[in-house]
């Protein structure tokens, strides 16, 4: 069985992390797998090389206007049995190639939760008619697809993200530091609610100062004006509120596993998510979680067991839940961490993830997944 994985690039994104992992796991299972991209960001490329996964940036496809033609030529020449595409544009490109001469079977993967049904979204789901499977990485997106496009219900199969349970692990029982470290791992974008989180920290600091926040997510290479402007606004807020000694914004890092081990809590204040990689990693690292009550988060974070949920639009609610978390006794803090790890082991293992993909790849034509 020959499988081609298609994605835009291998920069430091969640979808890229999952596709790199999928490629390596399929290779370990003996699948003839290769990966194509059309931009040359290489954050995860070393991982592919170490596993012996062939990787190629399709020359010419970086051009918006020529992308389809170069990708079509490449995919037709490769003659794969399957193409697995992640993210909207690669999924659209693979669907078009499949319509226009492609003999391969196709899995398209939805990596976020759709907020608005635009014309582009409707076109994308129309093109999915010929896909063998639609694989959302969250149950909330799976529900969305089945509700708005019921004709796709039979071939929609949710496969949540996996986490490396060996890499993301805390070898010893957690003992909370003073001040406590609240870790956030997310891009500094409007959808991640950085400004709202800073406002919540300002409220919390009015009556306690026994914590610091380490937010890893600054993109020093960003050329997108709105993202750069948003990050600058966040820095101004921190200075205006006098939080320079409390909230620290750091660049993205490949050594994030060590940061999880050094933290006491994990927080994710996003307005929406799919199944966040960083939530999986934090839970595998035995951290209590404080996150927004959106999408799939309540499927993994249970109040009174391993974390706290808040309304991301309500700054006071966010501050209150951060406060509750900081008030946990040492015994409860450690217990929440153990519970997070147990949930990760049950629901987020590499084996569960790759087995679900293999059940699709091995399914007979017009057959349903196991």
List where the protein language model places each region.
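Conserved donor-binding/catalytic core segment of Leloir-type glycosyltransferases
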Residues: 4, 174-192, 197-201, 213-214
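Acidic anion/phosphate-binding donor-loop and adjacent secondary structure
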Residues: 63, 146-147, 160-178
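Short His-centered aromatic/hydrophobic patch
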Residues: 85-91, 110
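A short, active-site helix/loop in glycosyltransferases that binds the activated sugar's phosphate group
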Residues: 131-156, 163-167
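Nucleotide-activated donor-binding/catalytic signature segment of Leloir-type glycosyltransferases, i.e.
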Residues: 228-251
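Aromatic "clamp/platform" in nucleotide-sugar-dependent glycosyltransferases that forms part
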Residues: 252, 271
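Short hydrophobic beta-strand element within catalytic cores of glycosyltransferases
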Residues: 288-291, 301
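Conserved acidic donor-binding segment of nucleotide-sugar-dependent glycosyltransferases
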Residues: 303-304, 308-315, 324-330
């Amino acid at each position: 069985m020959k499988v081609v994985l298609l994605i835009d690039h291998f920069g430091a994104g969640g979808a890229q992390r999952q596709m790199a992992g999928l490629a390596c796991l399929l290779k370990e299972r003996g699948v003839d797998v290769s990966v194509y991209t059309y931009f040359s960001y290489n954050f995860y490329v070393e991982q592919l090389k170490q596993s012996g996964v062939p990787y190629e940036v399709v020359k010419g496809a970086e051009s918006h206007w020529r992308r389809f033609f170069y990708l079509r030529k490449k995919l037709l020449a490769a003659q794969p049995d399957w193409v697995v595409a992640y993210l909207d544009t690669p999924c659209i490109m693979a669907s078009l190639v499949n319509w226009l001469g492609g003999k391969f079977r196709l899995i398209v993967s939805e990596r976020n939760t759709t907020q608005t049904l635009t014309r582009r979204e409707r076109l994308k789901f129309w093109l999915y008619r010929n896909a063998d499977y639609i694989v959302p990485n969250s149950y909330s997106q799976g529900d969305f697809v089945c509700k708005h496009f019921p004709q796709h219900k039979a071939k929609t199969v949710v496969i949540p993200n996996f986490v490396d349970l060996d890499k993301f692990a805390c070898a010893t029982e957690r003992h909370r530091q003073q001040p406590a470290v609240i870790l956030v791992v997310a891009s500094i974008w409007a959808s991640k609610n950085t400004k709202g989180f800073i406002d919540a920290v300002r409220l919390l600091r009015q009556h306690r100062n026994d914590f610091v926040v380490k937010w890893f997510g600054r993109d020093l290479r960003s050329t997108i004006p709105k993202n750069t402007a948003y990050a600058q606004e966040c820095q101004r807020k921190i200075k205006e509120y006098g939080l320079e000694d409390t909230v620290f914004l750091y660049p993205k890092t490949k050594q994030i596993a060590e940061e999880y081990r050094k933290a006491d809590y994990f927080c994710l204040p996003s307005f929406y998510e799919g199944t966040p990689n960083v939530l999986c990693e934090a839970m595998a690292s035995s951290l209590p979680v404080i996150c927004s009550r959106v999408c799939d988060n309540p499927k993994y974070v249970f109040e009174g067991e391993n974390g706290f949920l808040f309304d991301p639009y309500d700054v006071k609610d966010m501050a209150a839940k951060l406060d509750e978390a900081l008030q946990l006794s040492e015994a409860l803090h450690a217990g929440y961490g153990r519970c997070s790890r147990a949930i990760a082991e049950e629901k987020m293992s590499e084996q569960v993830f790759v087995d679900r993909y293999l059940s699709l790849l091995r399914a007979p034509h017009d057959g349903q997944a196991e």
